[in-house]
Amino acid sequence: DVLYRTILMPGFDQPFVEYHNFGAYMDTVFGEHINRDGWVTINFIPTAAHTIWGCLAGKLLVSDKTPVQKVKYLALFGVIALAIGFGPDWTHITPIIKRIATSSFTFASEGWVLLLLALLYWLIDLKKFNKYAWIAAVVGMNSIFIYYFFNTAGYQWFNGAVAIFIKGLFGMAGITPKIL
């Protein structure tokens, strides 16, 4: 966020406006074009935090702490990350923008992930509700294939099959495809 607020180039001087921010400027430097979907290359820096936090969560899960302590730590850090992420967004300091990976987005998304991890760890490892855990194991063992499948042929097939239900459901709620 500091770079977005301090490095203001002509035409790229609006920190959180799509196509007119530091990330868009850096895309023109790196590849001489701006991504039409608003994604920026420079967001690899803040999103590296997700990898680091994932490693720390993994270290916690394999530590000597009791399972209850692990759930408490995951939930506590999840709530703290949510507060750090949503606080600046709610006070209009830094908006949550996924495509440029603002600090608010990075913390808010990590908070949700840690809370979900705490819930799943509690359900599967503590309460032994693992009847359907094999599905997650299969997906985890084939994650690269699943990623590529849903970004190529699966994207067209899955979106077409699911769109009938999702568009109607979200349409009734007033959520447009642009928001999704």
Please tell me what each predicted stretch does.
Residues 1-180:
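Alpha-helical transmembrane segments and their immediate juxtamembrane cytosolic regions
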